[in-house]
Amino acid sequence: MAITQNYGTGRRKSSTARVFLRKGTGNITVNNRPLDEFFGRETARMIVRQPLELTKNTESFDILVTASGGGTTGQAGAIRLGIARALVEYDETLKSELRKAGFMTRDAREVERKKVGLHKARRATQFSKR
């Protein structure tokens, strides 16, 4: 018998997360490591759990995540979006609740490119009057 699972893709900054949602006991595995081991910061773990806590599904799913690219914050945001999309695939009625909380929106902010003649994207050399 095939395992029924729901899939969601999430992206943030330069990170991508592929999320597989299965009926289970609440285990979240990121790149074959438990969530608490993968993310050192509590904030990142909270971000990942937000959609599940909002929909009161913390104990009803096992989540398998493959995250790549970017850093901790970007990956946490990507996983959150992926989980939200997978939950909507599982149950369409959760969409309005997740949308209202802002979990269905792809954060479009990207790093601004460095400009020629400047130190960074906007940082110029110090202005000298004389």
From Swiss-Prot:
Family per record: Belongs to the universal ribosomal protein uS9 family.
Organism: Xanthomonas campestris pv. campestris (strain ATCC 33913 / DSM 3586 / NCPPB 528 / LMG 568 / P 25)
Gene name, Swiss-Prot/TrEMBL: rpsI
PANTHER family named among the record's database cross-references: RIBOSOMAL PROTEIN S9, SMALL RIBOSOMAL SUBUNIT PROTEIN US9M
This protein's name: Small ribosomal subunit protein uS9
Pfam families reported for this sequence: Ribosomal_S9
Entry's Gene Ontology BP terms: translation
Keyword terms of this UniProt record: Ribonucleoprotein, Ribosomal protein
SUPFAM superfamilies: Ribosomal protein S5 domain 2-like
Family annotation (InterPro entries): Ribosomal_Su5_D2-typ_SF (IPR020568), Ribosomal_uS9 (IPR000754), Ribosomal_uS9_bac/plastid (IPR023035), Ribosomal_uS9_CS (IPR020574), Ribsml_uS5_D2-typ_fold_subgr (IPR014721)
